[in-house]
Amino acid sequence: MTHASNSHPVTELTKELIARPSVTPLDEGCQTLMAERLAAIGFNIEPMVFEDTTNMWARRGNEGPVFCFAGHTDVVPAGDLSRWHTPPFEPTIIDGYLYGRGAADMKGSLAAMIVATERFVAKHPNHPGSIAFLITSDEEGPFINGTTRVIDTLEARNEKITWALVGEPSSTLKLGDVVKNGRRGSLTANLTVKGIQGHVAYPHLADNPIHKAAPFLAELSQTHWDNGNEFFPPTSMQIANINGGTGASNVIPGTLEVMFNFRYSTEVTAEILIERVEALLTAHELDYDISWTFNGLPFLTGEGPLLDATRHAIRQITGYDTDPQTTGGTSDGRFIAPTGAKVLELGPVNATIHKVNECVKIDDLEQLALCYEVILEQLLC
């Protein structure tokens, strides 16, 4: 085992960012560090603070097309510190890997894009179009005051993004083997099924909402929503939480609360899913309240300049072809895509994200910066 230092510029900047314990929604100076680097190469820096969230819109150039790198400085909590090999906010290199919370998600990507942009601007100081950074500290949290608020601000002044590259850790086994060229939509239901509380010995004087809801939940879980298509897998519904009862064994509960989530393809809409669920509730003659939380539309970036440039970059730097996919969770790309921007995600291997001992291969950080630089050259040269 080695604990050698590493002088790669991407690694060094990643270490500086990891050392700032920016647990969501805190930024802890990460954006200030990035802003200093960007201002030095001609970027206009526009902080946007909404409530407890720190955001930054940085732009170099006044003309289109606009290439935007979107990312976040916040990280998830470290969890059980005793299970970490090294302190999560003390970046440490061990056997070619950089350990620390945020190494892969996504401070490595932030550092790689900063260094890539510095190199690109040094070579092409008069590049056409514009380069922008949209950075938030509210991606891992409730995502209320982050990217969505920045996009609202940009839309209000008709400032459009042409291409958005999101630095989420898209890779699976090796850097660049997978890019995300779309994401499924996300829709969450909070359902309350009403009954009548009573003593378990006198069921005729009560109305058990768990018993009433069980056939509905069985049918809900077995419903086939769609077949998906060539870009998206079939729509998935998963029950996430069920809560009913007082904790006592002799009390029939008065209500049952169920939370379930759809990850849906472009073959259906949120409205169709809501209509089908509520029709099912009615068919089972349930007394219920339901509220819906819309978390994002599905989006897809097909063939075109952004996907072409990314494929070319990965092939040139790594020597293999990437696989565009739409699987996985949501990202802040869902807030950017509705503006008409083409959105793609490319970042490090995601095997350790949100886990203890999160890490990234240091060679991947440098390769990621090279990929980002080639993408810039393909789009803005």
From Swiss-Prot:
Homodimer. Zn(2+) 2 binds at residues 105, 140, 354. Disulfide bonds: none annotated. HAMAP family: DapE. Belongs to the peptidase M20A family. DapE subfamily. Pathway: Amino-acid biosynthesis; L-lysine biosynthesis via DAP pathway; LL-2,6-diaminopimelate from (S)-tetrahydrodipicolinate (succinylase route): step 3/3. One of its GO terms (molecular function) is acetylornithine deacetylase activity. It catalyses: N-succinyl-(2S,6S)-2,6-diaminopimelate + H2O = (2S,6S)-2,6-diaminopimelate + succinate. It comes from Shewanella sp. (strain MR-4). The lineage of its organism: Bacteria, Pseudomonadati, Pseudomonadota, Gammaproteobacteria, Alteromonadales. This is Succinyl-diaminopimelate desuccinylase. GO terms for biological process: diaminopimelate biosynthetic process; L-arginine biosynthetic process; lysine biosynthetic process via diaminopimelate.
